[in-house]
């Protein structure tokens, strides 16, 4: 028996410090509890979970932090130490996985998704998705990035890309660092609100070099999570050393959130920013505290990235953010939250035009997936994947965009979701 949960964010609380395990220990002394932070880069666990995982005040794991106070764990684990707890948690059954995938598909169709990029899957889950698609249980198209583990790399890389009409497996998901909200993002200079802390690399630069060299010898794409400016700098430098020798790599920097100004100029159609505009409007309330005024200018700089790259791929990053792509579109063009704050838009010089935002969610996203010849626009010869909305999001006022409702979702010309009044 175990209690699992997700969604806490100390930045939304009056006391913005990390929580502790004290209340969980009182309420659940004999049942392990693991509550994942909203960004997925921290866990709050109770003492029972710590004991089962063998974690104490002396535990150190490269690439992460066991938060302690007076030499004892507080219950918060940041990045890599989370794996120690995850290893002792019960795994979902095959039937539970099937039910979850079907439920996720229905939610996706409801919000007009026809292709989902799943950033980090193991071999077993990829083969399950393929099986469910082949037997007609799953219709959703999936661009599956394999998790960076020896087993996955050894299985998929020698075989080459696996591509069907529903599934594309041709990329590797790597984590360079953690998240800004949990101060796990790797920064060049210390955090403005934690002067002795710079965050940490989950995958250091030497390891990134070795992995990139291996991937570059295959037909796989490298897609690396990079939030902090130190992480982005390392990833872009490693990418540049490799992509110059490749004809059409389309390697992606996932999030590309905080960058040193000269590094923004290094984006191109070979090194693509894969961005999530909702991060800007979710983080804007506290990002300045983490980064300070000067660094903040080069954070969430989507229009500037577009100027150099020529394209940007837009995503929602669910379940970190809401699955609804209309909220992504709204955040990209308005740089406001759902209450219309701030009226002038957060760093409005980096908002995207409606045309760029739409391309980032369609044609450019397809290009970033090597799928621009099959999808991304309504043209003869491409798959008939499209949605009908109840309003024209290219024309209505900004405030009406979040409420846009999907009337119908079409996949391969077939209606897979309908909500017609």
Regions found by a protein language model. Name each.
Residues 167-184, 270-281:
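Non-cysteine beta-strand/loop elements that form the S-adenosyl-L-methionine
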Residues 77-78, 185, 317, 388, ...:
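Short clusters of small/polar residues that mark proteolytic maturation junctions
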Residues 132-136, 158-167, 244-246, 267-270:
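Acidic (Asp/Glu)-rich catalytic clusters
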Residues 1-155, 174-231, 244, 250, ...:
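Divalent metal-binding segments
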Residues 213-223, 230-251, 255-256, 261-265, ...:
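His/Asp/Glu-enriched, well-ordered alpha-helical/loop segment
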Residues 152-162, 274-275:
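Substrate-binding cleft/loops of secretory-pathway carbohydrate-active enzymes
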